[in-house]
UniProtKB/Swiss-Prot annotation:
It comes from Pyrococcus abyssi (strain GE5 / Orsay). This is 3-isopropylmalate dehydratase large subunit 2. GO terms for biological process: L-leucine biosynthetic process. GO terms for molecular function: 3-isopropylmalate dehydratase activity; 4 iron, 4 sulfur cluster binding; metal ion binding. It is an enzyme of class 4 (lyase). Its EC number is 4.2.1.33. Heterodimer of LeuC and LeuD. Keywords: 4Fe-4S, Amino-acid biosynthesis, Branched-chain amino acid biosynthesis, Iron, Iron-sulfur, Leucine biosynthesis, Lyase, Metal-binding. Binds 1 [4Fe-4S] cluster per subunit. [4Fe-4S] cluster binds at C262, C320, C323. The keyword Amino-acid biosynthesis applies. It catalyses: (2R,3S)-3-isopropylmalate = (2S)-2-isopropylmalate. SUPFAM superfamilies: Aconitase iron-sulfur domain. HAMAP family: LeuC_type2.
Length: 380
């Protein structure tokens, strides 16, 4: 039986109603959730949290008013609001909110990040999140599961983002809408495991989860990724599924590098970048945003902030930063951005005329030194 099947106690294709252990959302999605909730319910019947991470501090009067509306709703219903402490998915992990949970519903498409903890975590639209808040349960169609087996050991310059750009590209012609991705034999650290599950959404997977020993049985397919031979990967505009070896785009001039987001803003990932930049100077605008205040604090304690500042990096407050193109380093017309985020759709980080390439923090940091996309092999 698949891991998802065990968590939901049902077979693929079945429609089930299950109790929700946690519902959370952020300042970007809460206004629509509030609107839907107020049409149907008057009481929150499950454990819930709200995080201000997408556009915080408020850069406009409109956003400030939306923040006020969210605070008022949260006060009425006794929902904790966490402001400016970091990205929702990271904070759910750090605050221990997913402990002993089986099913988590989030008002963000990257809620499956929490599958690295072994839970069934799924992002939903405003109406479904409102229903989960008001009923404390939700209906689900149990997805099929694809087993992804990681074989071998990654070379020192290979990170989880390389694995995921490769996997997403290999799945681009496959219908994944009601499929889950289950990873096994994962040699990466916990920080990097969160990247695997986070990035799986870009394969159009319903959710993702990480298991320990692969038992087989019940899976719709089995995919093996040979880590020993996997090259550094880059996703070209305008899709995470446009993955190529970094050699294919090496030398592409860039205007800005961004290291951070719910994909790659954790301590280990920023540390990898800082080690590369230590004692050097970046040759292009480079922004780093820690995923949480705890990551930021550890960066200070272990000297990463000094290294990055001395290298010419701009350090942003904990949160989503420029990932969604709302503030803190949006892309201008005809600019080329190299980002460690998970999306590079047209207009994602600002101007629809900008081009966004996706890569790992290692590739991004090396590229920042040269002002062009650079193969990290041979540089480390």
């Amino acid at each position: 039986m698949t891991l998802v099947g065990k968590l939901l106690n049902a077979k693929p294709g079945e429609a089930v109603i299950r109790k929700v252990d946690l519902v959370y959302a952020h300042d970007g999605t809460m206004p629509l959730i509030i609107e839907a909730f107020n049409r149907i319910f008057n009481e929150v019947r499950t454990r819930a949290y709200i995080f201000f991470d997408h556009v915080y501090p408020a850069p406009t009067v409109k956003v400030a008013n939306l923040h006020r509306e969210i605070r008022e709703f949260a006060k009425i219903h006794g929902i904790p609001v966490v402001e400016g402490k970091g990205i929702s998915h990271q904070l759910v992990v750090e605050l221990g909110l997913a402990e002993e949970a089986k099913i988590i519903v989030g008002g963000d498409s990257h809620t499956p990040t929490l599958g690295a903890l072994g839970v069934f975590a799924v992002g939903m639209g405003a109406t479904d999140v409102a229903i989960a808040l008001g009923l404390g349960k939700i209906w689900l169609k149990v997805p099929e599961s694809i087993a992804v087996l990681l074989d071998g050991s990654p070379r020192e310059y290979i990170m989880a983002s390389d694995v995921m750009i490769h996997l997403i590209t290999s799945l681009k012609d496959r219908e994944m809408s009601y499929n889950a991705i289950e990873f096994f034999n994962v040699p990466f650290s916990f920080d990097e495991r969160l990247t695997l599950t986070n990035f799986s959404v870009e394969a159009n997977a319903k959710t993702a989860i990480i298991g320990e020993e692969y038992e087989g049985g019940g899976y719709s397919d089995e995919i093996t990724i040979e880590l020993d031979s996997l090259p550094p990967m880059v996703a070209k505009p305008f899709s995470p599924a446009n993955g190529v070896s970094v050699e294919d785009v090496e030398g592409t001039k860039i205007d800005q590098v961004f290291i951070g987001s719910c994909t790659n803003g954790r301590f280990e990932q920023i540390k990898r970048a800082a080690e590369i930049l230590d004692g050097e100077q970046v040759n292009v605008r480079t922004l780093v945003a820690p995923a949480s205040i705890n990551v930021y604090r550890r960066m200070i304690e272990e000297g990463l902030v000094r290294i990055l500042i001395d290298a010419g990096v701009v350090i942003l407050p904990p949160g989503c930063g420029p990932c969604l193109g709302r503030h803190m380093g949006v892309a201008g017309d005809n600019e080329v951005i190299l980002s460690t985020t998970n999306r590079n759709f047209r207009g994602r980080m600002g101007s629809p005329k900008a081009e966004i390439y996706l890569a790992s923090p290692v590739t991004a940091a090396v590229s920042a030194l040269y002002g062009e996309i650079t193969n990290p092999e041979g540089e480390l």
